[in-house]
C-alpha cells in the first residue's frame, strides 16, 4: 500500500454540494428484517427527489445482485458486504449526494466502523425499531418462517442477535403512526441540520 497515493480531485465535495444546492449526508437505516427500513427509506427518497434533491438509495437486497453478488451470509461475508457498502456510500456522499442505505447491519461495531469514515454530522443513524413480533407477523419474504424451521442459519432476531443502537440520531417504530408522518419526521430532522434548505420546503408540504 505504500506505493498507492490518494489522488486529489480538482473538484471537491463542497463544490459538488454547492452545485446541487444541498449538504451531502448518509442516512443509515438499521433494524430487523421486516422492520420497514426499505419502505421508509424509499418513501423519504421519493419525497426528496420530488423536491429536487439529488439522492440515491442503497438497498440490502439490491447490492447483492451486483456489487456483493459473490458474497454469502457467513459472518465474514456479511462484514465484507457492509464494508463495501460503506465505501460506496462514502464515494456517493463525496459526490454531493444525499445517500440513504437500508441494511439490517446487526452489530454496533459494524455501524460504528462505517460512521468513523465520515466527518461529524455526515452519518445519520436511523434505528427502525419495529418490534420483532411485528416484523415476524409481517414476514414479507417468508424468512422468519424458514428461520423458525431451522432452514436459515444465523438469522438476525431468531438465531443471531441484533444490537440496537445506543445513541441513534433518530428512532422510528413503523408499527406506530403512518408512513407519511414518519417521512415528515425525517424531513424535519434533515431541515434542522441544514441538509434541506428552508427555501425548498414548500415542495415537501
UniProtKB/Swiss-Prot annotation:
GO terms for molecular function: adenylylsulfate kinase activity; ATP binding. The keyword Lipid biosynthesis does not apply. ATP binds at residues 31-38. The keyword ATP-binding applies. Gene3D superfamilies: P-loop containing nucleotide triphosphate hydrolases. CDD domains: APSK. Pathway: Sulfur metabolism; hydrogen sulfide biosynthesis; sulfite from sulfate: step 2/3. Catalyzes the synthesis of activated sulfate. This is Adenylyl-sulfate kinase. It comes from Shewanella oneidensis (strain ATCC 700550 / JCM 31522 / CIP 106686 / LMG 19005 / NCIMB 14063 / MR-1). The gene is cysC.
